[in-house]
Amino acid sequence: MKELTVKRKGILTEESLKLWFLQKGYSVSVPIGDDDRYDFIVDFDGKLVKMQSKTSNLTRTVDCLNFATASIKYNASGTHRTQYTINDIDYFCTMHPETKQVYIVPVDICGNECNLRFTPPKNGQKKGVKMAEDYEGDKMIERILNS
């Protein structure tokens, strides 16, 4: 089987996430073209939320799910990395590559990348640590609906 390109992996992630929201009973809207900073909008009972889908990878130790939180464009003058802000999107949305668990993470708590941990750090650090269970899709939908 032919290996998937980065672009195709991104398309599969985005389409899988849109389907997940549809299966939950929420409407999904998509902008025309690819000129917007968000990938799609989810209508949570009248609350419109801009989502940016991101393909995630497991870290080598398999205790973290990692995804980039910037868009990268390539052209003749080089590589251009642009951070997402609260003006661009509301949430990043990703899916575990094996279990297909969906995670929804607020843009304003992410830096250059996001690591969602499945186990606490061995050194006991708590500051800046994002536990994956706190951002599971169903839990985050409840928070969005109640905010």
Task: Write out the residue ranges for each language-model feature.
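Mixed-charge (Asp/Glu-Lys/Arg
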Residues: 1-36, 42-147
